[in-house]
Design a protein with these regions (language model features):
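Glycine-rich phosphate-binding loops of nucleotide-dependent enzymes
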Residues: 1-338
Length: 338
């Protein structure tokens, strides 16, 4: 079973696991392929770890913890990836100001995003999180205002957001983030050509230099840049998507479920890249419902519930308990019965 829970809700995953347990009792065996560590520990008995196409470790889940598995997958000690000391590097300059943003699935969303800041926006499925992400890249219409570097954006205009230095690394990477029929090379410099290129003719040596720079900086693993983008792993595809926006020199980057469906090692690389972008003065918004992801990178977190901001959590308030409390609207029930 290859990533069977990717498009399932929590309830549906529980139902799937119950069916698997029953089939196991009947003598059915499973090979379960997933990047979601909690699922593996819940449903699997034994594990095999592959890295760079080779078997590097195997054993039983009852003899190891998540850190041990992760270290085997990435090939290094997790002590090198301690995000607990993350310090906000934001300045006072507002990169994006959102006021009373309202559209299908969300209402009255307002916040300021500063240069060097990493803002997380989270919420359960149906909270409006995905729709807000789309609105902030001009994918869907909205009312209210979005001001980018002092300029008011036109709702529903992707090209307008792109021209004003807003970039998106989208969810559903294969459907929305890459051009499946084009090569790795062509995918990487596409945003640059659309937003920055002013000449009539393309200078191949310039494009080669740009590709080489991003390939090295992002550690994109490919034998041939002319291979189709679909020949890459999910993690390397995600790096290409990020690389094309870095080449376009975007000021504001929207990461919508940035590590969905990629391996643990590449996840850590993406987290470090996000922190590096913030240190370089970029403004970043990360849309995710995975708490470990939020905790690793966020300076501040907006928690959505039924399309509205239910809480704004600072770094010192960002705990899994608080995120779930406000994501489920539990605070509203407490207020109702107070």
């Amino acid at each position: 079973m290859d990533e069977p829970s990717t498009a399932l809700s929590t309830r549906e995953i529980e139902n799937l696991f119950e069916i698997m347990r029953q089939l196991k009792k009947d003598g059915v065996s499973f090979i379960y392929i997933s990047h979601k560590m909690p699922e593996l520990f819940e449903i699997c008995d034994t594990y095999y770890v592959l890295r760079d196409g080779k078997l590097v470790a195997y054993g039983r889940f009852d003899g190891i913890d998540e850190n041990g598995i992760t270290e085997q997958m990435i090939g290094r000690q997790l002590a090198d990836d301690d995000f607990s000391n993350h310090v906000c590097v934001a300045n006072d300059q507002v990169a994006m100001s959102v006021k009373n943003l309202t559209g299908q699935g969300f209402t009255d969303i307002s916040f300021d995003l500063h240069q060097g800041e990493i803002l997380a926006i989270t919420g359960l499925q149906g909270s409006g999180r995905d729709a807000v992400a789309d609105a902030l890249f001009g994918v869907i219409p909205y009312t209210g205002t979005v001001v980018v570097n002092g300029k008011t954006m036109r709702p529903g205009s992707i090209s307008g957001f792109m021209r004003n230095q807003v970039a998106m690394v989208p969810r559903m990477r294969k459907e929305r983030g890459i051009h499946n029929d084009l090569s790795i090379y062509d995918n990487l410099y596409m945003a640059y050509l659309n937003t920055k290129f002013k000449r009539l003719l393309i200078k191949k040596s310039d494009m080669d230099q740009r590709f080489g720079r991003q390939k090295e900086a992002l550690a994109i693993k490919t034998e041939n840049a002319k291979n189709p983008i679909t020949s890459l792993s999910g993690g390397n595809q995600q790096k290409v998507i990020l690389g094309k926006w870095l080449e376009a020199d975007a000021d504001i980057l929207l990461f919508d479920n940035p590590t969905q469906g990629i391996d643990v090692g590449t996840k850590f690389e993406i987290y470090h890249l996000i922190l590096k972008l913030a240190k370089a003065g970029k403004a970043v918004i990360v849309f995710s419902q995975e708490f470990p992801e939020l905790y690793k990178v966020a300076d501040k977190c907006l928690v959505l519930y039924k399309g509205r901001i239910n809480a704004t959590l600072g770094r010192d308030e960002l705990t899994e308990k608080n995120v779930m409390y406000y994501s489920t609207g539990a605070n509203l029930e407490v207020e109702k019965h107070a």
